[in-house]
């Protein structure tokens, strides 16, 4: 939310202040893989537990294996096994999410076996790599809410691990100010697609007073396309997607409409 925070230091300071609101007898859980999260927790006089893949983390994964982007691992707490997890949601970022959940579960003295069973049974939430269906030729259609470059990279990296022939991503940027402020980061993230298809920017609460358009992103990303309407995007994807491809709609606006047009046979 760069329309509110001045810069990264301002964001870190805000999270530091948030940590200080934790009750004195409470717990602060921090991602040890994220240097900025660790900065936010510096000087916080509360009990702190860290999770991540770095050796210094209190809660770490061991015996990691992956199959088509889905992670299995043993959760270690202070070097001792707590539980085993085989995730039904893809991506390294979801392994980190599971470690965060295990950190809190261990602190609350929950039974490790049941925690592992619960995490392994979790199949995801709406608009987070949500499978919408398939095109007639079998290409999978998935929707994801990612709209910040770091989220986009995590989702696209997960898609890359899933052994699709190609990743075709229809992305709807969210707000003009964010698109302008993070333009280079959006370009880098979209380069992870085989084909990026850009929809017009979702304005939300804004008016375009800074002269930025989705077509600017499309011009900066190799092999990217820009279309003015969802109908044009859906038509392009129907013609372009092949068996073995992933069609991914991405954004925090209403880009999921395209996914439903492809899988429900709707025309909008």
Task: Show which residues each predicted segment covers.
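Glycine-rich phosphate-binding loop signature in dinucleotide/nucleotide-binding domains
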Residues: 108, 159-165, 240-245
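A short, aliphatic-rich alpha-helical micro-motif
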Residues: 19, 190-191, 241
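Active-site beta-alpha connecting loops in nucleotide-dependent enzymes
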Residues: 125, 145, 150-226
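Structural beta-sheet core signal
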Residues: 30, 50, 169-171, 198, ...
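Acidic, Mg2+-coordinating active-site environments of NTP-dependent enzymes
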Residues: 1-141, 164, 215-219
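Short glycine-centered segments of the SAM/dcSAM-binding site in methyltransferase folds
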Residues: 27, 195, 246
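Glycine/threonine-rich flexible loop motifs
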Residues: 2-9, 178-180, 206-209, 257-259
